[in-house]
Amino acid sequence: MAQQNFQPALAHVLSHEGGYSNNRADPGGPTNKGVTQRVYDGYRKGKGLAKRSVKSITMDEVGEIYDRQYWDAVKGDLMPDGVDYVVFDGGVNSGPGRSIMWLQQALRPIYTGPIDGVMGVGTLAALKAVNNNDALIDRICDARMNFLRHLGTFPTFGKGWTARVAEVRAIGKAWATGEKPQAANFVDGGQAKALVEDAKAAPSTAPADAATGAGASGLGLSGYLYDLQNQLSPLSYTSEWIGKVVVVVALASAVLAIGGLGYRWFANRRAKRLAEALGTAPA
């Protein structure tokens, strides 16, 4: 999509962003037409103008901010029809770098560089090598949804985000195939900023370490029980009661060990999925 088509793309983005909002659960804070107060303050400062509420932002200011801080940031002029709009919309909602990371993930295995959110020579070269931008858009939107589902704010804004990405997918694919895109609709929650700072924490392996002894001490609960079992075993022949205790201790040790190993597998699997969603997993 060329620069002259920036305005149609912006019109679709603004439909998704809506007007002024100040939802306490939205990490973006006070926002108008997708421009946060923080971004607006930075823009006004750069112009040598006094701060004012983002409620007072003009459409000329909106257009300039989107053009410079989002469209140019993702190098919209250098991307194919449809793909540029999809990356542009993602950049507005989650930051240009994050949206470029989704593009880089979607370009695998053609793209072999780091998932760093930089639209460099390698990313652009891989993009030019793609012969099915329709499918590429699907992969970008899939990566975006995977990221969104790993945010702690998804229960609050997930319905709106899901609706927005579904429309972005359809609009982008229409542009990619030369068809007339559908209108974009505002769905409450879809305008909330989706930021990596709100990502869920990876599950801790501490419970598994405590159970199996894989932590710093090297001796977990199952290890202590195993030692106790060894100490009591010689006495089990002299007392039926001690023999029963040995059996119980042995069973408890086995349950803790198996449970700890199972939880560690679960925690590592969740951590891997989180890393993939956030773009931090090794290539």
Q: What is the role of each PLM region?
A:
Residues 1-254, 259-283:
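Cell-wall polysaccharide-cleaving catalytic domain and substrate-binding groove, primarily
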